Amino acid sequence: MSKFNRIHLVVLDSVGIGAAPDADKFFNAGVADTDSDTLGHISETAGLSVPNMAKIGLGNISRPIPLKTIPTEDNPTGYVTKLEEVSLGKDTMTGHWEIMGLNITEPFDTFWNGFPEEILTKIEEFSGRKIIREANKPYSGTAVIDDFGPRQMETGELIVYTSADPVLQIAAHEDIIPVEELYKICEYARSITLERPALLGRIIARPYVGEPGNFTRTANRHDYAVSPFQDTVLNKLADAGVPTYAVGKINDIFNGSGITNDMGHNKSNSHGIDTLIKTLQLPEFTKGFSFTNLVDFDANFGHRRDPEGYRDCLHEFDNRLPEIIANMKEDDLLLITADHGNDPTYAGTDHTREYIPLLAYSASFTGNGLIPQGHFADISATVAENFGVDTAMIGESFLGHLK
């Protein structure tokens, strides 16, 4: 019998809690990640008030220097710890795959200086369209169409760009490059990015419409991902008949593998929280696992090195945390964590190699305190033990520590 009938895992994308022991092997603009500390530096430089997460015990997590504006709780309502990554990457897919029990020994490739000519030339030859070279770099998806959409409307060239994650994105105006043509080009791009020197997690078709100065991306986005190389705990759950619900980009990250119910993409963190709450309220969701990703922290504020915006985004989540809890049942378990860091005060614009926080809350708890410090995959091992399925490659359950 399950200790908790439902477990809800919420990933606050990029909300790290201090440099990992191997941060010296990861870099931002030539600077090692050794001094990165997403939550610590936001607290220090922008001020951070998250009373609801603090109540669970966020300020009690062991750190060399306590979080400046987040107090410790003498009698927290939950259990907390921090977790270390073992995989050789600090991107979204690597973090999420490890959380679900995999050890990624060959990281995906990211392209901070844009894709090599070899890749661009192949796409040009296949599509019969030129690629706008100036867009070939990490770019905001809305900014890139604002900057190059007018040119695409004139020339029919492709807008190919990337991000901090191992993705290749192609934006195309639906009146200039029909959606079906864009999809075929993306399918081809997927076929040539399955191994080094360009091992990519996702190819994303990004159609848009409108006129210069007023472009909008449409719902015809399509992701061409790769499935995890081995079964994750999501697969173990699904195979055992335990329902799994994906909110936000979780379905894309796992290429649908092990997901029995995709609740759709998020338009924003707030929309994602709305979707999570609707998921919690589903009458048929009496037992199972929900997995939510809230990406605004990372996409809107981490990469843009905006500590004040990041702070406000954390405030927004914390303000809505009581709503999430109010829609949980007595025997539900809530786990709040991250997938990597992205210190908005740090050098460069890339993710940072950090520990991730873990907050555990249930109305059924009679105890509180610290969970032993472990690794990302301990989350999936705990979920697996709770529902009576096998773990994946790695992970040690902390279920027995939750009283």
UniProtKB/Swiss-Prot annotation:
It catalyses: 2-deoxy-alpha-D-ribose 1-phosphate = 2-deoxy-D-ribose 5-phosphate; alpha-D-ribose 1-phosphate = D-ribose 5-phosphate. Its EC number is 5.4.2.7. GO terms for molecular function: magnesium ion binding; manganese ion binding; phosphopentomutase activity. SUPFAM superfamilies: Alkaline phosphatase-like (SSF53649), DeoB insert domain-like (SSF143856). Mn(2+) 1 binds at D13, D339, H340. Pathway: Carbohydrate degradation; 2-deoxy-D-ribose 1-phosphate degradation; D-glyceraldehyde 3-phosphate and acetaldehyde from 2-deoxy-alpha-D-ribose 1-phosphate: step 1/2. It holds the Pfam family Metalloenzyme. Isomerase that catalyzes the conversion of deoxy-ribose 1-phosphate (dRib-1-P) and ribose 1-phosphate (Rib-1-P) to deoxy-ribose 5-phosphate (dRib-5-P) and ribose 5-phosphate (Rib-5-P), respectively. This is Phosphopentomutase.
